[in-house]
Amino acid sequence: MQSKNKSLFQGHARLCVSTWLMFILMLVATSCDRRQLWDEWDELVPVDINVNWSKSRFAEFDEGDAPTGMSVYAFDQTGKQQPAVMVTNDLEHVQLKLYDGEWNIFVFNQSVMEYASLQFSGMDKYASAQVETIPQASRWFSTSRAEWVTRSHSPWAEQTRANAETRADEYSLTTKQPIWFASDCHEGVIIDEDKIIREFTPHTRFDDGTFYTKSAIIKMGVKVHFNGYENLYTVRAVISGVAKSYNISQMHALTEMTAHELTGWKGTAVTDSTGYVETTFQTFGLVKGYSYKPDELYLHLDVMLVDGETIMTYDLPVGNQVRVSNENDIDLIIEVKDPLDLPKVNKTEEGNGFDITVSDWEDEINIDIDL
């Protein structure tokens, strides 16, 4: 009888312990910090993005077309979330939905998939987002300047030698001129608990929360004077040392350099024996930290004379000849004022015609000579 009572007591004890354990577990479970079960979209805050393109200068560049869309990137300053990205055909307004917190936001025209001469990288981080030009083959330049690149101490040549990918491909010394690209950004956009944007700290120093886009591309002019101008038939050229990339959030060119082939040359005779050639090109501008030393920019110029055979080759340090242009549609200009002397040669039977084919003048670029 005593053994039976003992067994009943042990059973009741185990039941009580189990009951208390279940009760404690239920208390712990109900006290956990759990995410609410309603749609998380309700936790997001509507943020109105207004964009003004009036000073972005799109009409001044070769494309000349107004933007047809824009991209908006918003980055949580904690870095715990992926950027919120919105691509839209609306150019003036878009609404994002973001969590409470502090955000950095930038906008730019079009989407990353719509640029034929640009590529984007680092777009998952606000500080690293950048755009850069893409390689463009220039057989004549890579062939004719291969030795110069290997021995030159210009910053661009040294950077090129240090770049294994560029060195592996002899025809990737140049990149395409960038097409028009404009952007603006706001840092420290605070979205508080009352779902009100409290503060904007824009790079453009506006405080109304509107993005005022600015062109990342500038237009540079090149002008070269000649003695013996009557002997000039055609020219081709490359400018090396200009900026290859642009930081979107910092809104300035980076230190990486590139070279662009220059086309669209026009020639003007000043006297019977003097004249000049000129053109313009589009670029991200001068690299960050540019100091206007001669070897920071080089103009690589080939001049074919009217005999159709003689080619004069020049590698001109022009980094100290950059100045602000007085022309409305040109930002900076490089002018070689000391005339280059061209020797006297006999004209071919075709005269100054542009139909002469020379075997070692690949990708011939003609100029209009105004006599």
Predicted regions and their residues:
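Sec-dependent N-terminal signal peptides
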Residues: 10-23
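Short, low-hydrophobicity acidic/polar segments
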Residues: 81-214
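A sequence/structural signal for flexible, mid-protein segments enriched
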Residues: 168-271
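Acidic/polar, low-complexity intrinsically disordered N-terminal segments immediately downstream
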Residues: 34-143, 323-371
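Solvent-exposed loop and beta-edge segments used for protein-protein assembly and interaction
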Residues: 41-43, 97-101, 203-205, 212-216, ...
